[in-house]
Swiss-Prot record:
It is found in: Cytoplasm. Its main location: cytoplasm. Pathway: One-carbon metabolism; tetrahydrofolate interconversion; Amino-acid biosynthesis; glycine biosynthesis; glycine from L-serine: step 1/1. It comes from Bacillus cereus (strain ATCC 14579 / DSM 31 / CCUG 7414 / JCM 2152 / NBRC 15305 / NCIMB 9373 / NCTC 2599 / NRRL B-3711). It catalyses: (6R)-5,10-methylene-5,6,7,8-tetrahydrofolate + glycine + H2O = (6S)-5,6,7,8-tetrahydrofolate + L-serine. One of its GO terms (cellular component) is cytosol. The record marks 226 as: Plays an important role in substrate specificity. The modification N6-(pyridoxal phosphate)lysine is found at residue 227. Its EC number is 2.1.2.1. This is Serine hydroxymethyltransferase. It is an enzyme of class 2 (transferase). (6S)-5,6,7,8-tetrahydrofolate binds at residues 118, 122-124, 240, 350-352.
Length: 414
């Protein structure tokens, strides 16, 4: 199929080839990214991209859905097996749309919701004023403790009692510690609120049994299907059976039309991979690598938000290096290490500048990097940031990155 693309559209082919080269030659540390299997890519590039299938298995608005019904049922059944969910909807095109569907299911415009502050580790869809969630609903923020940088559950309870939200949102996009979902449910029950958990970043760790599972505690669980779950880009919703019909209606016909059946097929393949024994080994290696990388960074004198990590994610506070997150992201990319600038708790810089850098170990672990490689990456990051204006040092860092990536070939069959 790549041969067809090359003949048909040289410009698009060239851009894709260049991206493949980038992924092969750089160290991918963006916490929300991963490398899917070739089987997942084959499913996503299959003839299922041709099929419209509005509705759900057994109740479609189009004919000819007998085979895509099988695929969607496989995906749903595998998610139920992985997470122990009563009901699953695998049609959301993204995590943001999964969150939107839950909001539309139980909230009215202007309802009060308690969500995590974006700079403290939350997500745009958890009430940011520039996002639909912050526009449509009255979000009240909770955050982390100023000293420990961990969620202060007593503060969450106090704010829940004060504001009496209809919904509490737990989960994060930049929080490196375990979240106590049981405690969140207790708080929700105390104030009569629903609980939604967004486990997008940690879903793969939950699937492997290496992070507490929110499903037994939450009324609704949303997630992306990529990140640590190592599937295609997309979303899904897990919920109690009592909300099944409402959730399904919120997705279709509520906020989406036809599902992307080729993506759902790729999701199904990834879920099948997550059920294999070696996926637990992979997830454990993600955590081991993150801990080793965090230790290495601290030995190099770098400051980590909350002092370390319990999952795949590390947040570096770069202020003591007298640079910004924006500068750190740029200079690391220049030497071949891909990260993203990120706000930190109690941030004073703008979101376009930031005081932090967010990194994660899911992608490099998929590539086969282990503890020794984490030591080298920690050294490389510190060396690059401390010498960000020294071109000779940056050239040396580039050579070290090249030496490291050359040992771990990527997608040799592509």
């Amino acid at each position: 199929m790549v041969d067809h693309l090359k003949r048909q559209d040289e410009k698009v082919f060239a851009a894709i080839e260049a991206e493949l080269g980038r992924q092969r030659s750089k160290i991918e540390l963006i916490a929300s990214e991963n490398f899917v299997s070739e089987a997942v890519m084959e499913a996503q590039g299959s003839v299922l991209t041709n099929k419209y299938a509005e509705g759900y298995p057994g109740k479609r608005y189009y004919g000819g859905c007998e085979h895509v019904d099988v695929v969607e049922d496989i995906a749903r059944d595998r998610v139920k097996e992985i997470f122990g969910a009563e009901h699953v909807n695998v049609q959301p095109h993204s995590g943001a749309q999964a969150n939107m569907a839950v909001y539309f299911t139980i909230l009215e415009q202007g309802d009060t919701v308690l969500g995590m502050n974006l700079s403290h580790g939350g997500h745009l869809t958890h009430g940011s004023p520039v996002n639909f969630s912050g526009v449509q609903y009255n979000f009240v923020e909770y955050g982390v403790d100023a000293d420990s940088h961990r969620i202060n559950y007593d503060d969450v309870l106090a704010k829940a009692k004060e504001h009496k939200p209809k919904l509490i949102v737990a989960g994060a996009s930049a929080y490196p510690r375990v979240i106590d979902f049981k405690r969140f449910r207790e708080i929700a029950d105390e104030v009569g609120a629903y609980l939604m958990v967004d486990m997008a970043h940690i879903a793969g760790l939950v699937a492997a049994g290496l992070h507490p599972n929110p499903v037994p505690h939450a009324h609704f669980v949303t997630t992306t299907t990529h990140k640590t779950l190592r599937g295609p880009r997309g979303g899904m919703i897990l919920c109690e059976e009592q909300f099944a019909k409402q959730i399904d209606k919120s997705i279709f016909p509520g906020i989406q039309g036809g599902p992307l059946m080729h993506v759902i097929a790729a999701k199904a393949v990834a879920f099948g991979e997550a059920l294999q024994d070696d996926f637990k080994t992979y997830a454990q290696n993600i955590i081991n690598n993150a801990n080793r990388l965090a230790e290495g960074l601290q030995k190099e004198g770098l400051t980590l938000v909350s002092g370390g990590t319990d999952n795949h994610l590390i947040l570096i506070d770069v202020r003591n290096l007298e640079i910004t997150g924006k500068v750190a992201e740029h200079v690391l990319d220049e030497v071949g290490i891909t990260v993203n600038k990120n706000t930190i708790p109690f941030e004073t810089a703008s979101p376009f500048v930031t005081s932090g850098v967010r990194i994660g170990t899911a992608a490099v672990t998929s590539r086969g990097f282990g503890l020794e490689e984490m030591d080298e990456i920690a050294s490389l990051i510190a060396y690059t940031l401390k010498n960000h204006e020294n071109e000779a040092a940056l050239e040396e860092a580039r050579k070290r990155v090249e030496a490291l990536t050359s040992k771990f070939p990527m997608y040799p069959n592509l």
